[in-house]
Design a protein with these regions (language model features):
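Solvent-exposed loop/turn segments at secondary-structure junctions
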Residues: 50, 67-68, 106-107, 134-139
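Short loop or secondary-structure boundary microenvironments that flank
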Residues: 18, 91, 133-136
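Short, charged helix-to-loop "capping" segments that act as catalytic/coupling loops
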Residues: 106-110, 121-123, 153-156
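Early exported N-terminus immediately downstream of N-terminal targeting peptides
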Residues: 1-73, 77
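Low-complexity, intrinsically disordered terminal/linker segments enriched in charged
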Residues: 131-170
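Surface-exposed, charged secondary-structure patches
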Residues: 71-113, 164, 168-170
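Juxtamembrane/interface motifs at transmembrane-helix termini
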Residues: 43-47, 79-84, 149-151
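Short beta-strand edge/turn micro-motifs at domain boundaries
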Residues: 112-141
Length: 170
């Protein structure tokens, strides 16, 4: 899939380039803002709790989630140097989604890693990534479970999640 491969190539160029870790992180954040549906992933991650948000909470959550997502995503990826990802196949799931299958090529220090990209294709002019499934584990679903756990362990208090996200981002 051209969209995923070009996104991967941009990230690989950044990671393999002669940049400081901070520069890498900034460049990865730019790529994520352009190619990932951060807002959609954030709303999905809240699950049914999003229905109980007032406008202020929703706005605060979306802002906090974007900071959290970008920091988490870019700092994890910045650890890789010269990652080589090959797109293997793609399969249209339905009218709105295509699953793109790829592998992170093995090196001496790590085995092959299977990465599937769930791409939202409803608007062909504006493709966005909605989930990464790494070795069968959905990052969006994992995020949703973590957030539900935080909210549930705080008696359903969404503000506890907001505090947690803001603490992580600072």
């Amino acid at each position: 899939d051209v969209f995923v491969q070009s996104t991967v190539n941009r990230a690989a160029k950044t990671l393999g380039g002669n940049y400081t870790k901070e520069e890498r992180i900034q460049k990865l954040k730019e790529i994520a803002r352009e190619t990932v549906d951060i807002r959609g992933i954030g709303l999905y991650s809240l699950g049914s709790y999003r229905k109980g948000l007032n406008d202020d909470q929703k706005q605060s959550y979306e802002k906090a989630f974007e900071y959290y997502f970008l920091k988490s995503f870019s700092s994890r990826l910045a650890e890789y140097s010269n990652p080589e990802i090959e797109v293997v196949s793609k399969k249209k799931i339905n009218e709105n989604y295509t699953m793109v299958n790829s592998i992170l090529v093995a090196t001496e220090s790590r085995p092959v890693v299977k990465i599937d990209w769930r791409v939202y294709t409803k608007d062909p002019e504006n493709l966005v990534i909605r989930d990464l499934i790494i070795e069968g584990l959905s990052l969006a679903r994992t995020q949703k479970e973590e957030f539900a756990s935080i909210i549930n362990s705080n008696d359903g208090d969404i503000d506890a999640l907001l505090k947690n996200l803001n603490d992580f981002s600072n």
